Amino acid sequence: MGISVWQLLIILLIVVMLFGTKRLRGLGSDLGSAINGFRKSVSDGETTTQAEASSRS
């Protein structure tokens, strides 16, 4: 038995009532910038690793 659409809507409504839309919006933007920073650091690490490997050979 999974969670139905109605149950998800009720949970979403309760979360919005508890935290408010402004706080949730701020949390979403903070999470998005954290994910972008993580992706950038991973891609920078791969670039550095590839540059080190090519300089060694």
Curated annotation (Swiss-Prot):
Q: Name one Pfam family in it.
A: TatA_B_E
Q: Where is this region: Disordered?
A: 37-57
* Keyword Iron-sulfur (UniProt): no
Protein's job: Part of the twin-arginine translocation (Tat) system that transports large folded proteins containing a characteristic twin-arginine motif in their signal peptide across membranes. TatA could form the protein-conducting channel of the Tat system.
Signal peptide residues on this chain, from the entry's feature table: none
Query: Which processes are annotated in GO (biological process)?
Result: protein transport by the Tat complex
Q: What is this protein called?
A: Sec-independent protein translocase protein TatA
Give start-end positions of Polar residues composition bias: 44-57
* Lipid bilayer topology: Single-pass membrane protein
| Localization | Cell inner membrane
Q: Which UniProt keywords apply?
A: Cell inner membrane, Cell membrane, Membrane, Protein transport, Translocation, Transmembrane, Transmembrane helix, Transport
Q: How does it assemble?
A: The Tat system comprises two distinct complexes: a TatABC complex, containing multiple copies of TatA, TatB and TatC subunits, and a separate TatA complex, containing only TatA subunits. Substrates initially bind to the TatABC complex, which probably triggers association of the separate TatA complex to form the active translocon.
Q: Name one GO molecular function term.
A: protein transmembrane transporter activity
Which residues span the membrane?
1-21
Per its UniProt record, what PANTHER family does this chain match?
Answer: SEC-INDEPENDENT PROTEIN TRANSLOCASE PROTEIN TATA (PTHR42982:SF1)
Q: Which protein family is named in the record?
A: Belongs to the TatA/E family.
Keyword field contains Cell inner membrane: yes
Quick one: a GO cellular component term?
A: TAT protein transport complex
